[in-house]
Design a protein with these regions (language model features):
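Acidic, proline/glycine-enriched N-terminal capping motif
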Residues: 1-91, 99
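Conserved, structured C-terminal
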Residues: 1-34, 106-277
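Short amphipathic beta-strand starts and helix->beta connectors
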Residues: 39-48, 93-103, 132-135, 179-187
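Acidic active-site catalytic centers that drive phospho-/nucleotidyl reactions
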Residues: 54, 103, 199
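Short secondary-structure transition/capping motifs
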Residues: 59-64, 95, 105, 115-119
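Internal amphipathic helical hairpin motif
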Residues: 66-100, 155-183
Length: 277
């Protein structure tokens, strides 16, 4: 793929080149690595040791304001009664007909602050369009956040080494504010690999290559490898990809996402009436 100025480079771009990236695709208008040492070697490291890579193309959407929770409940059909601060939830965004706009990981970082980590698409424009006429007191923007994903059975050991055990008790689909040698980030026990995973949501893109290098050096103690998103393992894990496996022509029920819909909750949401039928 040609490299140009119209597509955004991630904060880890130079590190990708340094460690042998073999190609890129475009995802959320950013360059996303497609390979390093080959799919088989990367797969074996993913299921046996520990891997990490550039997932900055998961461009975050931040929702702030007194009505942030109400807005998040309005744009998707999952019941968020138990979404406390520090919780992460897998969600789908639906249109007025119940069609799926995209899927995403939702992080609640504060009482009135959420991040939405979507699949490929223009989700931020959809949300900003809804917000204009919602009457809700919120702001929506893209923050300076760039995820780096760590995955594999030894990923917990790598996190323990990097953070001196500080996040050993971090629960599944939980997130915490943290830092690594002065590099600010949110750490979440989330991922898109089918293996034990963590995501480091870097909060200063100028420090991307510094973070990549620190993770690389620590990972060598666990036979770590730099990888790209591994399609083989996501298929095995039953993980669906928006745009490839499903799209707006599908509703949650047709692809087995019933658990992400609660039409009996009192809260109104986009597509509720359509999904009741």
């Amino acid at each position: 793929i040609g490299i140009g100025t119209r597509i955004r480079k991630s904060p880890y771009y130079d590190s990708n080149l340094k460690y042998g990236v073999t190609g890129f695709t475009v995802y959320n208008k950013m360059y996303l690595p497609t390979g390093f040492s080959g799919p088989e070697k990367e797969y074996q490291s993913l299921i046996n040791d520990v891997t990490f890579g550039d997932f900055a193309a998961e461009r975050q959407i931040e929702i702030n304001g007194p009505d942030a929770l109400d807005f998040v409940r309005f744009i998707q059909p999952r019941n968020l009664d138990k979404c406390d601060i520090g919780s992460c939830k897998y969600i789908i965004l639906t249109d007025m007909n119940g069609g799926i706009i995209n899927d995403a990981c939702l992080l609640r970082l504060d009482e009135n602050k959420f991040w939405i980590s979507p699949g490929d698409g223009d989700v931020i424009l959809w949300l900003q369009g809804i917000a204009i006429n919602s009457g809700m007191d919120i702001t929506i923007h893209e923050p300076d956040v760039s995820p780096l994903q760590i995955s594999g059975p030894k990923s917990g050991k790598l996190i323990q080494k990097l953070f001196d055990g500080k996040h050993d008790e971090l629960g599944y689909y939980k997130a915490e504010q943290t830092s690594l040698d002065g590099i600010p980030m949110v750490i979440a026990r989330t991922g898109w690999s089918g293996e034990l995973s963590y995501e480091l949501y870097l909060q200063d893109r100028k420090l991307g290559n510094d973070l990549f290098e620190k993770v690389y050096k620590a990972a060598q103690d666990f036979n770590g490898r730099v990888i790209a998103p591994n399609t083989i393992r996501t298929i095995e894990g039953g993980l669906l990809s928006y745009g490839s496996d499903f799209g707006r022509e599908h509703n949650p029920y047709t692809i087995g996402f019933d658990r992400l819909v609660d039409v009996d909750q009192e809260i109104d949401f986009i597509g509720k009436e359509a999904l009741k039928k």
